[in-house]
């Protein structure tokens, strides 16, 4: 493996000059730069990231904790983070925790050992334990995204879930729906509580009664949506519309309802949440609440860079505003 001394010897310059050319830390004549880069190419020389990190006190590496990167919402946010990391010359270490305490603990320890410059957190489970683990590493800059735990030492980007729940429900009401069901994620999740609060606000504003039996608990995955679809199919009196708290459940619900002979939106209307890429291409295309996922990823990375540069500034909370995307899964009844 070639060293910086080998490059300097082949180029006929000092190791200091090679360092300045590679790191762009000082003006070097163009002819000299060309000689150095030619030697770098011939020797297939790669600078030592370890040595550079020791000298600069920076590894240019970011860690990211996610519950499940295969989740379509998470994957689009991750894509945004990775894209901006690459553009800024940072490496992203992605850690799938599966919501498992031991994996969260071990990954945080590993990221600390690797001296990452900062950590992005997008986990939805074991919030108190995760908060405590993150707070133990107070020297590492952090940004918590979406469902993550509140931390006294981390900036946070959140979705205005209460407003999103309100917008989805109001759109159904504006289209003549009064018998509305909700398919939530786990009830203990803050985002779910806020979306239910938005649902209740819209129903109260329209002076409509709420059937508490129609506020149904899922897990943000298709399997519970299938069970709920079967439950709705068996109901003597069905809701005319279902507000699903993410698009994955909405698509699973629609698929199963249609398998059961219930047409969407002719028999039951469906509205989702997230606006994942697949929502536009499903049949029928899903009406949903849009979350700017790639922008969330970009903003999270930019905020983390600011925190890395200034570790002492006060904790900040950034709120992303939801928008409705109208497609073809809500029937107009009025």
From Swiss-Prot:
It comes from the Bacteria. Residues 4-23, 48-56 bind DNA. The keyword Transcription applies. Hypoxanthine binds at residues 73, 189, 220, 274. Residues 2-56 form the HTH lacI-type domain. GO terms for molecular function: DNA-binding transcription factor activity; transcription cis-regulatory region binding. Keywords: DNA-binding, Purine biosynthesis, Repressor, Transcription, Transcription regulation. SUPFAM superfamilies: lambda repressor-like DNA-binding domains, Periplasmic binding protein-like I. CDD domains: HTH_LacI (cd01392), PBP1_PurR (cd06275). The keyword Transcription applies. Pathway: Purine metabolism; purine nucleotide biosynthesis [regulation]. Consists of two structural and functional domains: an N-terminal DNA-binding domain, approximately the first 60 residues, and a larger C-terminal domain, approximately 280 residues, which imparts the function of corepressor binding and oligomerization. Is the main repressor of the genes involved in the de novo synthesis of purine nucleotides, regulating purB, purC, purEK, purF, purHD, purL, purMN and guaBA expression. PurR is allosterically activated to bind its cognate DNA by binding the purine corepressors, hypoxanthine or guanine, thereby effecting transcription repression. Homodimer. PANTHER family: HTH-TYPE TRANSCRIPTIONAL REPRESSOR PURR-RELATED, LACI-RELATED TRANSCRIPTIONAL REPRESSOR. This is HTH-type transcriptional repressor PurR. The lineage of its organism: Bacteria, Pseudomonadati, Pseudomonadota, Gammaproteobacteria, Vibrionales.
């Amino acid at each position: 493996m070639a060293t910086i001394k080998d490059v300097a010897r082949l180029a006929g310059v000092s190791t200091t000059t090679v360092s300045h050319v590679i790191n762009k830390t000082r003006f070097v004549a163009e002819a000299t730069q060309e000689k150095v880069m030619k030697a770098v190419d011939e020797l297939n020389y790669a600078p030592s990231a370890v040595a550079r990190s020791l000298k600069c006190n920076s590894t240019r590496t970011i860690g990211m904790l996610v519950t499940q990167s295969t989740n379509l919402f998470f994957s689009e946010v991750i894509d945004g983070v990775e894209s901006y990391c690459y553009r800024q010359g940072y490496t992203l270490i992605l850690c799938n925790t599966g919501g498992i305490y031991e994996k969260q603990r071990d990954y945080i320890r590993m990221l600390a050992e690797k001296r990452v410059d900062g950590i992005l957190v997008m986990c939805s489970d074991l919030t108190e334990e995760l908060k405590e683990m993150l707070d133990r590493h107070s020297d590492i800059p952090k940004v918590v995204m979406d469902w993550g735990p509140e931390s006294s030492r981390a900036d946070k980007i959140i979705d205005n879930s209460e407003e999103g729940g309100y917008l989805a429900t109001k759109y159904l009401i504006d289209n003549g729906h009064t018998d509305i069901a909700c398919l939530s994620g786990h009830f203990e999740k803050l985002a779910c509580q806020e979306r239910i609060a938005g649902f209740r606000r819209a129903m109260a504003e329209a002076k409509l009664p709420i059937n508490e039996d129609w506020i149904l608990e899922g897990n943000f995955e298709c399997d519970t949506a299938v069970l709920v679809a079967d439950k709705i199919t068996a109901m003597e009196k069905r809701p005319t519309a279902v507000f699903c708290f993410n698009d994955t459940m909405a698509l699973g619900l629609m698929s199963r309802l249609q398998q059961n002979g219930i047409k969407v939106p002719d028999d039951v209307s469906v509205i989702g949440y997230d606006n994942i890429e697949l929502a536009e291409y499903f049949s029928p295309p899903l009406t949903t609440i849009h979350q700017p996922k790639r922008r969330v990823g970009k903003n999270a990375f930019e905020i983390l860079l600011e925190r890395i540069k200034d570790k002492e500034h006060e904790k900040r909370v950034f709120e992303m505003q939801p928008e409705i995307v109208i497609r073809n899964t809500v029937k107009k009844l009025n």
